[in-house]
Structure formats: C-alpha cells, structure tokens
Amino acid sequence: MSEMTPREIVHELNRHIIGQDNAKRSVAIALRNRWRRMQLEESLRVEVTPKNILMIGPTGVGKTEIARRLAKLANAPFIKVEATKFTEVGYVGKEVESIIRDLTDVAVKLTHQQAMEKVKFRAEELAEERILDALLPPPRDAWGQNEQSEDTSNTRQIFRKKLREGKLDDKEIEINVAAPQMGVEIMAPPGMEEMTNQLQGMFQSLAGNTSKKRKLKIKDAFKALIEEEAAKLVNQDELKEQAIYSVENNGIVFIDEIDKICKRGESSGPDVSREGVQRDLLPLIEGSTVSTKHGMVKTDHILFIASGAFQVAKPSDLIPELQGRLPIRVELEALSSHDFKRILTEPRASLTEQYVALMKTEDVDIEFTEDGITQIAEAAWTVNETTENIGARRLHTVMERLMDEISFDATEKSGTKFVIDAAYVQQRLGEFVEDEDLSRFIL
C-alpha cells in the first residue's frame, strides 16, 4: 500500500494531469485514509468504512486519467471497469460481482510478483548452480555420489565468472525445465465458479508437475530456471491469503461511465443494464461477501470511486440508495484554452514531446514555438466551443491534422528541421477551425 501523503499524491498527479485540483485532493485524501485506517487498533479499524467518491464532469477533462495514474500510485489492488458492461443478475451478460473476482485476480498477481521479487536473489543463485551443473556435470564416485575435487571446483569458478559476465549467454545447453501447465478454460454460469475451480484443479492435477528436457540458450534457460526456483520458494496458499486480505482492506474499484446506467424517463419492461445494475451495485458498495476462485472476499472496506459526464442524465437520476453510498461529490471543470496550452507542454510525456520524439526516429527535428502552441490550444478550444465539447481529446485530433503532412513525408525529409509556429498552424488548420461544417466532421 502507498504511504504517500496527500500533498505528495497531488504533486505526482500534477505531473500528468492539468487542473482539477478538487478531484485530485479528494482521491489523495481517500488514498491516504486507507493507510491511516491500517494504523488503527483492530476493534476501531473494523468500524472505519471508506468514503466513496462520485466524480462529475464533462468528457475529456481528466476523470479516467486520474484513475489510470491513481492505479500506479496506489500500490494496492486496483481495477477500472465500465458500468455499461454489466447486466442485472439473471440476464445474459456480466454481473457486477465479477468486478470483485477480477479485483482478486489482480491482487493475487500483485502479491505473487512481490513475493517473487523477495526470493529473486536466492532463486538466481539456485538457477546459476543448475546451469553450472549442466555445463560441468560433477564427477561421481563408485557409489554414484557427487564427488568434489579441487580441479573441478576451480573450473566451476572460472565458468561461474564467465556466466556472470555474460560471455556464455549464446551457448546452448540441454536442461530439465518444468513443462507449462495445461490451461483449461471452463465457461460456467454465474454462481457456479466453485464447480469451475474444482474442474480446473482436477484437470491440472491429471497433467501433474512434469518436467521436460529442452535445448535453450543459457540466457533463456537462466530466466526459465529463476522463475521455476522462485516458484518453489513461494508458498501459494499464503499468497492467496495475503491477496484476499489486501483486497478486503486496500482494494480500490473505479467505475467509469456510471451516468450511462441512469434511468432516462419512463420506460416499459425490465431495465436490465441500467437501474438493475444500480441495484446490484448496492450490496457490493455497502458491504457483502463475494465468492471467488481464491476464496470468500468481503467488500465492506473496498473503496469505490465512480465517475460520469452526466451530460444527459443528472446525479439525482441515480437511485437514491446508490447516491447515499457515494457521499463525496467532486465536480471537474471544463477546460479552457489556457488549460489546453498547459496540457501541450507541462505534463511528463506531453503531446508535443511525443511528436518531437516520434519524428526524431526519422531524423526529422520538430520545434514548437510559444505562439504555435498558443494557436494550437486556441484552435482546439474553438472547435470544442462550436461543435461537441470533447475536452482534451480534441487536442489529439488537432495535432494529427497539424502533423499529417510532416508525418507522411518524414522519410524523404530526413535531416530537415520544421518549426511549428502560429503561421504554420494557421495555414494547416485555419479553414477547418473557421468553417463549422468542416470542423464538425474533420476535427
């Protein structure tokens, strides 16, 4: 779990996302509260429930980007899902409980990676010994036991030195490595996961833990043997317990496009992918127990962050019970031309930086001037105002149109330098920005 302070989290988010300070503060506080809760005594910790968040704002202002960046910062089980993917229980489609199953899978993978990292040094030592045994089989005595001699030991040290220096990487050896497990995917109806897991376990046990002799280059054999030895050093049952504990106490679920499951007006017949999904989300957010292939998972302390543009629907169109379970409301603001200008230059790996790097691969130098960047930002903002406002995503469309000619001719213009100034931007984009019909269909 991340131990970053709210200020540090906001600072890290600022490196990738422009503006939206209120949203950043809310998610930073929510993330820090996960850590604070874990410092409490057990009796009080159980009572402290997460304050779920509802982010409201037009499309393209950074809601999903905040989720993406938060996933990297959290160092905890994190999953982002689209609300529109789910249907009510009993109908064809994914049910909302699969969110927790997927989150548990993420946690198991994360815990497994962390455990493998801890034993990596020991696994490398064991893998090295197995490769040296394949290169220099130890001599055996009359009883078939390994016999160590000074000469053998010296030769082994010479080979060990060469192996560590990478001088033997391309040499081929024949070695026993674990055969890949037979993957059996069984599709089962909702609620039958336990039976599916038992069948999968049965098929895998039939295959057994067989090893197979393979001819590999030493560098490839070394990687395979490290994984094999590390897996032997890790207790899989303990890993599952740790993963479930991590999900229950540190798990974060980000539900995007929640406005798309709001009920719109009066409609007859069952609303299986809208209000039905909202009702199914209630017990999950309030706290329930979900059966997964790794064990039972309680959702009482999982943090839920929901987001939606709410351009057609309103937050009040969500069913009242769900509104009550998302107590923290954050409104994200629409982006101005000044914000667009900052987006083009300030974030790490900004759009302009990406295009400069891409063209550099063709030995073409690109320079964006200050007035050129201002003109690009103005063009994107103007098109958003006159047509549909799609936020920062408009910059991708505008930049592609602007760089179209240079990108196409880059191979023939190797060694050339292009300066993207206001005049060049006006020449390439002027007619599209000024003509509403052209901007509507092309930009």
Curated annotation (Swiss-Prot):
Residues 145-156 have a biased composition (Polar residues). GO terms for molecular function: ATP binding; ATP hydrolysis activity; peptidase activity; proteasome-activating activity. ATP binds at residues 18, 60-65, 256, 321, 393. CDD domains: RecA-like_HslU (cd19498). InterPro entries: AAA+_ATPase, ATP-dep_Clp_protease_ClpX, ATPase_AAA_core, Clp_ATPase_C, HslU, P-loop_NTPase. It is found in: Cytoplasm. Gene3D superfamilies: 1.10.8.60, DNA helicase RuvA subunit, C-terminal domain, P-loop containing nucleotide triphosphate hydrolases. GO terms for cellular component: HslUV protease complex. Its main location: cytoplasm. Keywords: ATP-binding, Chaperone, Cytoplasm, Nucleotide-binding. One of its GO terms (biological process) is proteolysis involved in protein catabolic process. Residues 137-156 are annotated as: Disordered. Belongs to the ClpX chaperone family. HslU subfamily. ATPase subunit of a proteasome-like degradation complex; this subunit has chaperone activity. The binding of ATP and its subsequent hydrolysis by HslU are essential for unfolding of protein substrates subsequently hydrolyzed by HslV. HslU recognizes the N-terminal part of its protein substrates and unfolds these before they are guided to HslV for hydrolysis. HAMAP family: HslU. A double ring-shaped homohexamer of HslV is capped on each side by a ring-shaped HslU homohexamer. The assembly of the HslU/HslV complex is dependent on binding of ATP. PANTHER family: ATP-DEPENDENT CLP PROTEASE ATP-BINDING SUBUNIT CLPX-LIKE, MITOCHONDRIAL-RELATED, ATP-DEPENDENT PROTEASE ATPASE SUBUNIT HSLU. This is ATP-dependent protease ATPase subunit HslU. The gene is hslU.
